[in-house]
Amino acid sequence: MSRFLICSFALVLLYPAGIDMYLVGLPRIAADLNASEAQLHIAFSVYLAGMAAAMLFAGKVADRSGRKPVAIPGAALFIIASVFCSLAETSTLFLAGRFLQGLGAGCCYVVAFAILRDTLDDRRRAKVLSLLNGITCIIPVLAPVLGHLIMLKFPWQSLFWAMATMGIAVLMLSLFILKETRPAAPAASDKPRENRESLLNRFFLSRVVITTLSVSVILTFVNTSPVLLMEIMGFERGEYATIMALTAGVSMTVSFSTPFALGIFKPRTLMITSQVLFLAAGITLAVSPSHAISLFGITLICAGFSIGFGVAMSQALGPFSLRAGVASSTLGIAQVCGSSLWIWLAAVVGIGAWNMLIGILIACSIVSLLLIMFVTPGRPVAAHEEIHHHA
């Protein structure tokens, strides 16, 4: 079992590493490529676009051909794209490399969640996804620090060679450690079960909405945090870094505590708690009379996301034993596109950073609480269905 957990964690971590590690080198990258930092900030959106594009096909391929045939090319593409970015001499080539990086990371991301659905029952999967969420929270803190240390001695290209090295490690794990987990193709008598695994299932769609709104909350916070903390609240760059590190610490602590909470409380209780914390955060930020109260509201955001996201993802994947790859892809596409659409629309309409965050917090909490309370599984979700794995 440990091999599946290690491989799943490694496959997922390419996604945040690809986002966060290069940011510290952005000024030098812009200077070398004769582009402005503003022009290269689109590299974030291009990377997410690559991930979304990968998710359009990766899940279906993973369900038909297996998890390894998607993970291995995905890791290989991430390696090639990282090297391509390091060799880019124009901003256009650099952005093309970032898109390819996103494609590779997206393939690996989809496979990771499909593997966890294949190998874990509902309760254990919720615990593992909460732990995975905690580990993922470490990356936005550690990746820029690692990038800074690398750039003390080496040029910005070394950041992408470091990413390529990470990709090589994931590729080796996928080749030699990961075993295929895709369930055997269903017999004719099992076709009704396959047909029941519909993406239009009300319970699944409700969890897609909940997780998409939750991701929109956390990405809105990350995206607006420089404006909120430095421009509006007046913190210095060093203080901003410290606050973000502390918020990551809150996320990690809560994420690592959630598996223990699942041994005491029902998953539904934790999901409700998550959304109540979002609502409390939105109200706190809306009426906050001081920076200290605002910072408390920000910690509520991190705690709320960490308590509920892993549980919601586990519930979303629960009904799918034969189509876990497609379900994982659908979740990923909805989360990436939904959150990006919200941030883009808010910017186009001219909603300020503060109101953007408050708005998504309150909307997410109200909609999600209604879905949690009124949309329940239409049939009992099997704790775990024994599967015959392909060699």
UniProtKB/Swiss-Prot annotation:
Cellular component, GO, one term: plasma membrane
Record keywords: Antibiotic resistance, Cell inner membrane, Cell membrane, Membrane, Transmembrane, Transmembrane helix, Transport
Membrane topology term: Multi-pass membrane protein
InterPro entries in the record: MFS, MFS_dom, MFS_Efflux_Transporters, MFS_trans_sf, Multidrug-R_MdtL
Chief place where the protein resides: membrane
Localization annotation: Cell inner membrane
GO molecular function: transmembrane transporter activity
Superkingdom of origin: Bacteria
Transmembrane segments: 4-24, 42-62, 69-89, 93-113, 131-151, 158-178, 203-222, 245-265, 269-289, 293-313, 324-346, 363-383
PANTHER family xref list: CHLORAMPHENICOL EFFLUX PUMP RV0191, PURINE EFFLUX PUMP PBUE
Family to which the UniProt record says this protein belongs: Belongs to the major facilitator superfamily. DHA1 family. MdtL (TC 2.A.1.2.22) subfamily.
Its biological purpose: Confers resistance to chloramphenicol.
HAMAP family on file: MFS_MdtL
Name this polypeptide is given: Multidrug resistance protein MdtL
Gene: mdtL
